[in-house]
């Protein structure tokens, strides 16, 4: 592991905007912020928007700057990647931006039913290998999971046209699966 990666992991632990639940918390599905993100983390009741697979978090930060009336949470498993967005959000004093470091498989352990208003899947790994198609962030099992914490009428916004075309007709539990973008 490179020394920059170790330094970034250590620095992430000092950023208020980085949330890193332990494996036991998410595995048991009782994460402390579940159902309490607005009250306990953001301190407001604004709509929550997730960016899944946020990578370096630049898009999450840009959304937070453009829409200060919403709360944004970038989600990625790679802490060294999240560092860039977390550092920018911290330096800019952004109170409406957070980063959640967890595996997508455990994300429903972190959010209560109806807690999330919108989900952005902007630049996901396409998982081109036939054996890994089920790992796509837009695979049916993930869409079903997102529906559990997406509010009624909430939207999933793919950030690229090929996936948008594929998702256009999907309805899941009364949720609008795709916004017109």
Task: Describe each model-derived feature in a short phrase.
Residues 52, 75:
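Conserved beta-strand/loop positions that form the S-adenosyl-L-methionine
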Residues 55:
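Conserved glycine-rich SAM-binding loop
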């Amino acid at each position: 592991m490179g020394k920059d990666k170790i330094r970034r992991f250590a620095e992430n632990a000092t950023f208020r905007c980085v949330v890193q639940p332990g494996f036991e918390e998410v595995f048991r599905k009782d994460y402390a912020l579940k159902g309490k993100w607005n009250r306990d983390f953001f301190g407001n009741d604004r709509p929550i928007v997730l960016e899944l697979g946020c990578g370096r978090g630049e898009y999450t930060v840009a959304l937070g700057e453009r829409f200060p009336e919403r709360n944004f949470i970038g989600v990625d498993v790679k802490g060294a990647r999240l560092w860039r967005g977390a550092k920018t959000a911290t330096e800019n004093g952004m109170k409406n931006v957070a980063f959640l470091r967890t595996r997508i498989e455990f994300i429903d352990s972190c959010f209560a039913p109806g807690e999330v208003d919108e989900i952005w899947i902007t630049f996901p790994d396409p998982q081109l290998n036939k054996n890994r198609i089920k790992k796509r962030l837009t695979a049916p099992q993930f869409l079903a999971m997102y529906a559990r914490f997406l509010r009624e009428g909430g939207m999933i916004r793919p950030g690229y046209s090929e996936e948008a075309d594929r998702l256009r007709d999907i309805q899941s539990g009364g949720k609008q699966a795709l916004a017109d973008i």
